[in-house]
Amino acid sequence: MAESIFRKLRDGGEEGELAPALTIEETVASPFGLDVSGYLLTNLSSSILAGKSSSQGLVLITFSRSPSFYLQLLKQKGIVVSSSSKWIRILDCYTDPLGWIDQSSTSFSEGSSLIKLHKCVSDLKKLFSSIIEAGRELVGTGKTRFCVAIDSVNELLRHSAMPLVSGLLTDLRSHAQISSVFWSLNTDLHQEKVTNALEYISTMKANLEPLCPSSDGQRNALENLFSVHQDFGKGRFHVRFKLRKGRVRVMSEEYHVDQSGINFSPISSVDTVIAATKSLLPKVQFNLQLSEKERVEKEKVVLPFEHQDDGKSNEIYDGRRSLVDGKIETTPLSSMELQTDVVSSGKGGEIIYFRDSDDEHPDSDEDPDDDLDI
């Protein structure tokens, strides 16, 4: 499904539509959002160089890692970035996000002409202008488009309020020259309303789920320690696509992180059934299954709506005195006679039902209180 995300970002949106946006959600248990960002970054770079992308340039905004890290990543994948490259620009928000370092003392070695130092990341209007300016250096001011990659919005949310950050991302999607946008987010660092706001802006959401979830509290912590360590770089990669007319498509696959990077593979059928079964069970701390003894005791309980006649034959009164002392009463009694008999017998408070007709079955679904006579 990572390939489907890449194709969406590569192809971009239709003319007049907002640019596709992707949120990559990671957690402390599965902190591989930057690996997914690196996977998309290298694939988009390859497609731009091959002329197979709707965009002709890429603007990378770095918050969590230095620009040299991404230059080295591209180099490892066989993508050489030189000072004469006309397809990529890097906006460095990692080196001096608060503007405390003297610019004269800051130097870049490899690809320094491609890297622009951006200070004071809390000024989002200035950041937006810097992104557009960097993109236009690549594609000009016409209809040619470029894509925008933000390695992490965690640091951006640290310096700016959520409404301002969502406004920046919305403005990027709305710009006519931006073909696609993607960013990563650690959901454990933010409130649920922040995550929901970013998901609302996005047209795609990808979240990483660990193969061995962490145990609650200290229970079974030692038992799961070895399996957690062994399967730390493995897990599930779930993707949700927002389609037209409010439809949603959800897809999943497995991921594995090694020294070469992150790799994706389809989920086996057995694992799919097990995962689907586990997902249907609520996340509770008590056992929902009954033991054999509990099941036997449960069957002994007589519920109020069940017959409690200890094996005797069940007789339903149909309003005509069906059985009295083993003799069948053939002549129906009038309502006045029945009321007289009840009063004379000294019994009060009995409920007597009269059937509307002989065609009505005793177990009819009609409300018997319609003919109630006390």
Curated annotation (Swiss-Prot):
This protein's pathway reads: tRNA modification; 5-methoxycarbonylmethyl-2-thiouridine-tRNA biosynthesis
Biological process (GO) annotations held by this record are: tRNA wobble uridine modification
Any one Pfam family match given in the protein's UniProt record, by short name: Elong_Iki1
Key words, A-Z:
Cytoplasm, Nucleus, tRNA processing
Keyword Transmembrane among UniProt keywords: no
Q: Where is the signal peptide?
A: none
Gene3D superfamilies from the entry? P-loop containing nucleotide triphosphate hydrolases
Might you report a single GO cellular component term?
nucleus
Family assignment from sequence similarity? Belongs to the ELP5 family.
Check the record and name the PANTHER family matching this protein. ELONGATOR COMPLEX PROTEIN 5
What name does this protein carry? Elongator complex protein 5
Q: Which organism is it from?
A: Arabidopsis thaliana
Its gene? ELP5
